[in-house]
Amino acid sequence: MFSKIFPPIHTEGYKFLVIAGFITLVLLFISGFLGTIGLLLTVWVYYFFRDPERVIIGDDNYLVSPADGEVIKVEEVDGPREVGLDNKKFKKISIFMNVFDCHVNRTPCSGKVEEILYKPGKFFNASLDKASEDNERNYYKLKDKSGNDIIVVQIAGLIARRIVCETNKNQELNQGDRIGMIRFGSRADVYYENYEPLVKIGQRTISGETLLAKK
């Protein structure tokens, strides 16, 4: 019960929490009002970096959401050329994470990480179409248990300025394992083949729990 109300935070959040706490103490010495603002900032930092446990279905017939957020795209596209799959057709689901969403990302399926590719870029609003091509991003090319290519792309946004990768090439992952996070508002794209989408535009998702697609 305690962990549900006060979930643990991601290690990336520790230094920000310390900084926010220090600022709060300084502001308290100046005035109670400013101290209250600092306290609210500290609470928000804790909330942003929260890393709650999730109930994972553990079923290879499904893909689960890699991110908390809102579905903004469900479409058929060419695969990402950055990982050499632009000669294949994929379905793609895009999920936008606002600054109040949990930003820890998880793998949609069990399988092997065949490639990880970081691409520097710009910081347009992550909800825009061009964010998939122009923004800073990190690609995870996975092979699921049936041999299907699954690609997860972490995309930095207007406020997000750092993509954190916690996964290694050739690593074997279980569905719902943490793969990294993006700081302060961002987007996750999932490219997949041989699954049918289960979500619609405007739907809210929970990382590791919401079923995105089914074989």
Annotated model-derived regions:
Residues 1-215:
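Contiguous, well-folded functional domains in the mature portion of proteins
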